[in-house]
């Protein structure tokens, strides 16, 4: 329109894709203007995944910033309790196809993709393994040199849970092998800053 603002309301968009991917619900209010893309009350659901976003904004100085999305676009958002199943991700990242795991999460995002701060992150991969705290990523797009700062409010896991993650499916040569002595510790709890 003339003001440069486009607004769209989606309500319960769904489809079955030929590959087997099934979208049960795509809903939300979307706004695009010369400085921002904003999603409010965003819902993305499949039979195994549910992403619920109170609001998320992608802010930029001008549309040219979208060409350098990972550095030039500033993200602010709040994600309510959500879950992602790796089977659903595998439609977009085929190497994840054989991973049978669901991740539950919520948190608040601030920053660019490359330098992202996640506040009040609640992340759970099993009833025994979870993380609650803040995470600050510096250089996230260069994983080999990425710095990760953790403010751990509450974290717990066990040797068996960590070893159950099949790292070979993430492209690494070997799965995690921890010393037998750690098994005697049972469930390990952590708090602090790293």
Give the predicted meaning of each segment:
Residues 55, 135-136:
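Short, T/G/N/S-enriched strand-turn elements that build extracellular solenoid repeat scaffolds
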Residues 140:
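A compact, surface-exposed functional segment
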Residues 69, 134-135:
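Conserved two-metal-ion catalytic palm core of "right-hand" nucleic acid polymerases
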């Amino acid at each position: 329109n003339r003001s440069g603002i486009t607004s769209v309301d989606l309500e319960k968009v769904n489809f079955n894709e030929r590959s087997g991917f099934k979208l049960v619900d795509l809903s939300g209010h979307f706004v695009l203007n010369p400085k921002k893309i904003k999603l409010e009350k965003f819902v993305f659901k499949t039979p195994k995944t549910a992403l619920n976003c109170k609001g998320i904004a992608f802010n930029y100085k001008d549309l040219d910033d979208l060409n350098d999305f990972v550095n030039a676009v500033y993200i602010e958002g709040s994600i309510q309790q959500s879950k992602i199943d790796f089977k659903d991700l595998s439609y977009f990242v085929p190497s994840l196809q054989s991973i049978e795991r669901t991740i539950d999460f919520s948190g608040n995002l601030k920053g660019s993709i490359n330098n992202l701060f996640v506040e009040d992150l609640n992340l759970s991969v099993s009833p025994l393994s979870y993380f609650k705290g803040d995470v600050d990523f510096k250089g996230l797009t260069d994983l080999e040199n990425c710095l990760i700062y953790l403010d751990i409010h509450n974290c717990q896991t066990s040797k068996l849970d960590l070893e159950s993650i099949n790292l070979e499916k993430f492209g690494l040569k070997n799965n995690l092998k921890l010393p037998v002595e750690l098994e005697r510790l049972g469930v390990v709890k952590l708090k602090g800053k790293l």
